[in-house]
């Protein structure tokens, strides 16, 4: 018997015990039981009804989000000329992003309180970016960035940093990446946010700042045996780029 089943059986035993005590009390206090019982029944109906409705909405939101993701991942006609009949394609990435965006926005508007709805808002921001609608993208991603869920907020901040970099607002991008680098998100691990920050510094010509950040990642991202972690390996490569070989140099 797995742990989940044991927990469920324990809850059922507790419920049975409480019910038995309740029946004994009701036999001795009939009038009070009628009055209190009516109120409790109403409360239970509200709670159970609300929980059922929330589950139903979450499932509906997940299905709608899945449909939107299917559109977002649909093949482009130029990349898949021999697509089987019935498979929808798009002429280019912008058209695909626009179609998916409409669906993501609808899911976010209708199911915004559910987790799929929150992820739909994030994807709405991403697809706005791909459409070139920077204003709408910023608005959506700012909302995601302020989410109470740290992992969801981190996704919003990372995408927003990318948007700001595209817009030439590097100072704003740096602040977001610095914030992510100090966090503990699982969706945007701190070390990888720091790598992004180093790359941004490098693109701005701030080589000393880039090397400083990469060196910090290289020194800190290690396992228990002192071996470099994934981010540490990337940081090491950034700090010590391999020169192009003779064959590569001739081909350039």
Language model region names:
Residues 23-24, 28, 203, 207-252:
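Terminal, low-structured helical/coil segments at or just beyond the last alpha-helical repeat
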Residues 1-39:
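N-terminal positive-inside, membrane-proximal cytosolic segments immediately preceding the first
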Residues 107-117, 131, 146-155, 181-190, ...:
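Short solvent-exposed coil/turn linkers within tandem alpha-helical repeat scaffolds
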């Amino acid at each position: 018997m797995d742990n989940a089943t044991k927990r469920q059986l324990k809850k059922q035993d507790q419920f049975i015990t409480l019910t038995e005590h309740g029946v004994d009390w009701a036999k001795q206090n009939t009038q009070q039981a009628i009055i209190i019982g009516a109120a409790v029944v109403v409360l239970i109906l509200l709670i159970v009804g609300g929980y059922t409705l929330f589950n139903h909405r979450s499932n509906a939101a997940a299905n709608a989000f899945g449909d939107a993701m299917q559109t977002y991942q649909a093949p482009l006609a130029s990349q898949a000329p021999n697509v089987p009949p019935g498979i929808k394609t798009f002429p280019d990435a912008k058209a695909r992003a626009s179609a998916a965006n409409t669906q993501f926005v609808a899911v976010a508007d209708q199911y915004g309180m559910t987790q799929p709805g929150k992820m739909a808002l994030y994807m709405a921001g991403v697809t706005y970016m791909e459409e070139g609608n920077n204003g709408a993208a910023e608005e959506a991603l700012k909302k995601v960035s302020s989410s109470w869920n740290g992992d969801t907020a981190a996704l919003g901040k990372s995408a927003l940093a990318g948007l700001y970099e595209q817009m030439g607002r590097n100072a704003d991008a740096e602040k977001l990446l610095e914030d992510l680098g100090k966090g503990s998100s699982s969706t945007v691990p701190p070390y990888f946010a720091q790598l992004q920050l180093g790359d941004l510094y490098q693109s701005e010509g701030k080589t000393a700042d880039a090397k400083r950040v990469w060196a910090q990642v290289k020194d800190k991202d290690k396992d228990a045996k002192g071996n470099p972690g994934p981010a540490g390996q990337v940081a090491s490569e950034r700090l010590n780029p391999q020169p192009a070989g003779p064959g590569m140099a001739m081909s350039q």
